[in-house]
Amino acid sequence: MRVRIVMRLSAAALLAACGGSTGPTGPSGPPAVTVVNGATLPSGTIGATVVIEGHNFGTSQSVASGHVVFSTTAGGRDTTVIASAADWTNLLIVTTVPVGVPVGPDTLFVETSGGTSTPIIFTIVAKVAFSPSTVSWIATTGLPVGLSGHAVAAATLPGVTPTSVVYVVGGADSTNAPRDSVLYATVSNSGTLGAWNKSAVLPAPIAYAAAVVATPSNSPVMGSSYLYVIGGDSTASGKPVATVYIGLLSAGGAVTGWGTTTSLPAPVHSLGAVIFNGTVYVAGGSGSGNAAVATVYRAVIQSDGSLGAWQAQPSLPFARSYFGFGINGTFLYALGGDSGTVTPNDSSLSAKAISDVVYAEIDVRTGNLTATGWTSGAAKLIKAVTKHTAVMASGNVLVSGGLYNGATTGATEESYGGLNPDGSTSSFSGATGSHTIASVGGGNFFNHAATGYLDATGAFHVLVVGGDDVNTPTKKHKGVFYY
């Protein structure tokens, strides 16, 4: 899997770039790196693609006599490979983490005939092991109250000792009314969750929103981390909002206060959202009247955590809501969902539930989706499914729960497939027996939430939280399961 790392150029850097190079004669002074992978404290695995933004790199590698270097704390020096001439420009360099760089904090710098850039800390991380075919679920700390339609996000917050935290935001209780509650729990060394703690409540009740966390490792925020709650449903019947809330996080994980940032172009609930290279991407969902939409947008995260303007991207092939959404490498994926008009709390399987998987690649040089747009994969989900979740890592995806033909017996509660380097997917298989949440007392569920996270040892875990009960739709689950 190739993961691209992009350094984003500020307006000040762009102005500095004007006249910062003498063209074919090479740089007039030392290069300057502004950001890597859109992040303040970037990280990546061996072989990960590194995209460096800044200025005065020289118009080409040969003209600049340039190199990108990883330097280790032990004094080692590893020079990266620039695959093509187009990967080195005066403002941006694309390369990969070289084989042999040790795991841990290293420094990255650019050297040219004009000098050497100030080193940037770049942490090499081990590739996570994620094999959904061998999943075995374990119950961990349950929610204080049963919920469905809640948003879940996880992040490792920086500090002397980094803290991994899981957030549960909003959602609907047994009355189906949205809630304003915000809960968080820290992750133990073994991957279990600690007690759920209450945090500052949302400015207004919300359900069926999307949530993501910006940290210095995935965005250009300086020092602090931020929790975003995007869109959502403000009533039990599905009235979407365009509001984007932003919560400032303490080092221990608590939300210390809420504000708002740039609203979505249109109200939507049950959408998908991810952060990649300092940018938030959102897709699909349900708009006015609960009709599914196909829109896709992106907004760049600023150093103070605020979002820039939302920019339209190539739309999904057709409208889609209540779907699985995520990113693997540089590809966005949308799996299953419903293309019709469905209320959030409807427990029946719609005739417009879908089984297809679509994907689109992000151009790391611009942050936009490539001109190709979305491609429908040849491999489909085992069944049409909606109101499910999808968690992706290390070239695999795990699809959990939802409404599908056979959901009352948990026939295909868990399914998994491979995500290939070119974006395509391999065929999906089902996990049964001891590999299901129902087998450990979790019941059959939909309108739940799921996320992936790392424990302190670097092990990757998948978490499934709450949800509606398929067999008794008025029942909300408190159960939380991980593996």
Predicted features by range, described:
Residues 1-10:
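Bacterial N-terminal signal peptides that target proteins for export
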Residues 15-17:
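C-terminal motif of bacterial Sec signal peptides marking the signal peptidase cleavage site
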Residues 19-70, 75-81, 115-133, 139:
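Beta-strand/beta-sandwich contexts
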Residues 46, 86-94:
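Ser/Thr- and Asn-enriched, surface-exposed coil loops between beta-strands
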Residues 50-54, 68, 93-95, 106-111, ...:
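A structural motif
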Residues 99-104:
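Surface-exposed, short loops/turns at beta-strand junctions within beta-sandwich domains
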Residues 113-115, 470:
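Short, solvent-exposed loop/turn segments at the edges of extracellular beta-sandwich modules
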Residues 125-483:
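Kelch-like beta-propeller repeat domains
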